[in-house]
From Swiss-Prot:
Belongs to the FGAMS family. Monomer. Part of the FGAM synthase complex composed of 1 PurL, 1 PurQ and 2 PurS subunits. Mg(2+) 2 binds at D118, D269. Mg(2+) 1 binds at E94, N532. The gene is purL. It comes from Sinorhizobium fredii (strain HH103). It is found in: Cytoplasm. One of its GO terms (biological process) is 'de novo' IMP biosynthetic process. This is Phosphoribosylformylglycinamidine synthase subunit PurL.
């Protein structure tokens, strides 16, 4: 059914477009008349949270975004960071949460496709992908279906496109029952002097449509992504886009080939709000108007209206401002790759966004007010409240060995092999570390020694307990995971997933998490260069756990010295860098409390950023000098889980002493921050100990590698074979239709 552009504008229609009454009044004052139906759709798309960041912009400005290596920070399709030798890494993380809940395969697949386009739009060839996934409780009736669809979608698109998936996260919690999270990360390599931007320059230049044809899929997708769900969720299935990775691969090659010709003045991928957002952003950034003739847009469906064409989120499409003299050369490239190439408009000097369709003007709007001058809110938020500490006598006991087996086989700590074996982790032939370690590592092609490390991290239960400390911890753990490979952390991207910002308690979570993220990034010289905000992650008023995911990139100057988590050999000393007295103290909000005792009370662990930096720099120095044989950061599950993971990765056991006079539960399962487990050969032990003394760092020897079991203090030994079988069993058992007991 076609929709007339003269459809009456009623309060119900305005509300259905996600516009508040005061926002509609602002529209009337801007254009001094009633908008057409197409214009209402354009305002709805550009003024929603997904495109305008109207609730978050104020706080995003407080984040550190500059640094000596930063070539491009937030505001472009992706961030760009210098990695020496004239090379740069281009990267970003973005959410596709709402579509993936409604239609998990296509939602996840097009999330991958969208983030890859963000990267190659800048002129970079994608070299790595990650995904951070959050699902509802394992026993929820939709969870297994959603896991299956999302993982298949991520793999189906990424594998076909030809980019290795080198890391990510998968976590379950009942708070995601009605609103899962799919956060997709991509990184690419480019030359520092060949970066392409979205700012249009020059009047009267052709605006060119590139890629696949436009259909009705995804119409209204950006508006849907800016609202919480209710019982009408199934009706939103048509707003989910459909992806074709093979077309995207052709689009990548065509764009990179075109970029070498000097034809491109500005280029923008068509993501959220499709043709509308890409055209408005290009024009508004360049202080230019844009005129589009929709009769020239390649379409794959009949009788498409102006409203549908402007708001379609059909995938694998680009918009470009072209040098006129290069038109035939550019067209030939896209024809060769089997893609559409159509001049659909021109740049103008009047700062108007003008849309023509079938000989009529269907929209004529001020472009700056649609783009970078959209509404901005300073939403109310409540002061932070920190939970009371747990009393010493309120820490429940459990057998240390039995707790370890329970944790390694639990829903949230078990092996993710079932997931990542569905992804191509080796394509392109440059992967050096695969999922399952602290960070994925990819060799920089064409360079003998250089590699890049990638990690994504957040601990939502910490953010829920204390958004400020949780925000700090997300950054610190990402930085720590990169460091644990030997990489120098360069910069980060954020994917900020929260509930309804109109609720002051949710806005408070957001504000304090941003403050924590900013403080940590400044302390660790880890600027935020790109990112995404996803709000209204709620269903029927039930919000998700606050989940500000941090994706980070680090540089390894010599990958031959790169560290791994697996024990290298028997009879090596195990040390705990950055250990507090007693090795571990903070048991509140730990997975021990959550998964063994079903409790999520108490404060999040404090992150001492000066300590974090000092210990991380020290460990990175040990790795660079070849003094350690294995490294693993201590995070969820504490020392016990870190040692178990190192043993399972290598097949070599470990004996850990219990710290005299200290609680073994806190020592083994405490989640104190800023710690690394390292292993050292006997002949290098004294040299490392001397370094630690000179640096004023705690570096106790806590045990020895060897044997076929892991023994923690006085607890019974658990064989590595039993740990492995328990660790590997949960996911395939669950996905096979049997819910593992007690999880």
């Amino acid at each position: 059914m076609t929709i007339s552009n003269t459809r009456p504008i009623t309060p119900e229609l305005i509300a259905s477009h996600g516009l508040k009454p005061d926002e509609y009044e602002r529209i009337l004052s801007l254009i001094r008349r009633e908008p057409t139906f197409t214009e209402l759709g354009i305002f709805s798309a550009m003024w929603n949270e997904h495109c305008s960041y109207k609730s978050s912009k104020k706080w995003l400005r407080t984040l550190p975004t500059k640094g000596p290596r930063v070539i491009q920070g937030p505001g472009e399709n992706a961030g760009v960071v210098d990695i020496d030798d004239g090379d740069c890494v281009v990267f970003k993380m973005e959410s596709h949460n709402h579509p993936s809940y409604i239609e998990p395969y296509q939602g996840a697949a097009t999330g991958v496709g969208g983030i890859l386009r963000d990267v190659f739009t800048m002129g970079a060839r994608p070299i790595a992908a990650m995904n951070a996934l959050r699902f509802g409780a394992p026993d929820h009736p939709k969870t297994r279906h959603l896991v299956s669809g999302v993982v298949a979608g991520v793999g189906g698109y990424g594998n076909s496109f030809g980019v290795p998936t080198v890391g990510g996260e998968v976590e379950f919690d009942a708070r995601y029952n009605g609103n899962i999270l799919v956060n997709a990360f991509a990184a690419g390599l480019a030359r520092s002097d060949a970066i392409f931007y979205s700012k249009a320059e020059g009047v009267g230049l052709p605006v060119v449509y590139l890629g696949a044809k436009t259909g009705r899929d995804g119409v209204g997708g950006a508006t849907m992504a800016s609202a919480e769900f209710d019982e009408s969720i199934e009706e939103k299935r048509p707003t989910v886009q459909v992806g074709d990775p093979f077309t995207e691969k052709c689009l990548l090659e065509a764009c990179l080939e075109l970029m070498q010709t000097g034809a491109v003045i500005a280029i923008q991928d068509m993501g959220a709000a499709g043709l509308t957002c890409s055209a408005v952003e290009m024009g508004a950034k360049g202080d230019l108007g844009i005129e589009l003739d929709l009769d020239k847009v390649p379409v794959r469906e009949e009788r498409m209206t102006a409203y549908e064409m402007m708001l379609s989120e059909s995938q694998e499409r680009m918009l470009m401002v072209l040098r006129p003299e290069k038109e035939e050369e550019a067209k030939a490239i896209f024809v060769k790759w089997g893609l559409d190439f159509a001049i659909v408009g021109k740049t103008t000097d009047d700062l108007r966004f003008r849309i023509l369709h079938q000989g009529e003007e269907v929209a004529n709007l001020p472009i700056k007010e649609l783009g970078d001058e959209a509404p901005e809110y300073d939403r109310p938020w409540t002061p932070a409240k920190s939970p009371s500490p747990l009393a010493t006598n309120d820490i429940p006991r459990a057998d240390v060995a039995e707790a370890l087996l329970k944790l390694v086989g639990s829903a949230n700590n078990s092996s993710r092999r079932w997931v990542y074996e569905q992804y191509d982790t080796l394509i392109q032939g440059n992967s050096l570390q695969l999922p399952g370690g602290d960070a994925g590592v990819v060799r920089v092609e064409g360079h003998a020694t250089k590699a890049l490390a990638f990690s994504s991290d957040v601990t939502p239960r910490y953010v829920e307990a204390d958004p400020f400390e949780g925000g700090k911890q997300a950054v610190a753990e990402c930085w720590r995971n990169l460091t644990a490979t030997g990489a120098l952390p360069l910069a980060a991207t954020d994917n900020l997933n929260f509930g309804n910002p109109e609720r002051p308690e949710i806005m408070s979570q957001f504000v304090h998490a941003i403050k924590g993220i900013g403080e940590a990034c400044r302390a660790l010289d880890f600027p935020i260069v790109s990112g995404n905000v996803s709000l209204y992650n709620e269903t029927n008023g039930q919000g998700i756990l606050p989940t500000p995911t941090i994706g980070g990139v680090g540089l390894i100057s010599d990958w031959a010295r790169m560290a791994r988590i697996r024990f290298a050999a028997a009879d090596e000393a195990i040390l705990l860098a950055g250990a507090p007295e007693g090795w571990g103290t903070h048991i509140a909000q730990s997975v021990y409390m959550r998964d063994v005792h079903g409790r999520t009370d108490g404060p999040a662990p404090h992150v001492d950023l000066a300590h974090e930096r000092k210990v991380g720099d020290f460990v990175r120095g040990l790795i660079a000098d070849g003094l350690v044989t294995a490294v693993h950061d201590c995070s969820s599950g504490g020392l016990a889980l870190a040692v178990a993971e190192m043993a399972m990765a290598s097949g070599i056991g470990a004996t850990i002493e219990a710290p005299a006079g200290h609680d073994p539960i806190a020592a083994f399962y405490g989640e104190d921050q800023g710690r690394y487990v390292v292993t050292v050969t006997a002949e290098k032990l004294e040299a490392i100990a001397s370094r630690a003394r000179d640096a004023g760092l705690s570096l106790p020897v806590i045990g020895t590698t060897g044997g076929s079991a892991v023994k923690l203090g006085d607890a019974k030994a658990v064989s590595v074979e039993e740990l492995r079988s328990t660790h590997e069993a949960w996911f395939p058992t669950y996905m096979g239709g049997d819910l593992a007991p007690d999880n």
